[in-house]
């Protein structure tokens, strides 16, 4: 079984990417505080890279900005690619399949005021979650 649940804040505004075959995708990092203090008495933060596809990606880009607090459920995925220096890079990320909006902040807003989250979607369109 490959399942993960996260609650964290966006480190920056997510950006929607349009790919071939009418697919849309966004990726972002969530800042997640650990639930204990280190030997210096400080709380460490993990930065988890996440990827989202389809309508869910569109909703995230529309409603979430830097500092928004969300809950994300999905699966861990590893992949590799060759960068511009011809070095093979390995990456571990969470492919998000479900999101709960807890505290949303407007995108590109100086005062980062909270906005109302969209109503929960009772029926999922599973074709949006098919990966290439």
Cite the ranges covered by each PLM segment.
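Acidic, gly/ser/pro-rich intrinsically disordered tails
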Residues: 1, 18-21, 43, 101-132
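Core FKBP-type peptidyl-prolyl cis-trans isomerase
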Residues: 4-45, 80, 90
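OB-fold and OB-like beta-barrel modules that bind single-stranded nucleic acids
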Residues: 5-10, 30, 66-78, 96-99
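Activation segment
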Residues: 13, 33-35, 97-107
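Intrinsically disordered, low-complexity acidic/polar segments
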Residues: 17, 37-39, 59, 83, ...
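Beta-rich strand-turn-strand
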Residues: 53-89, 105
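Short aromatic/basic micro-patch
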Residues: 93
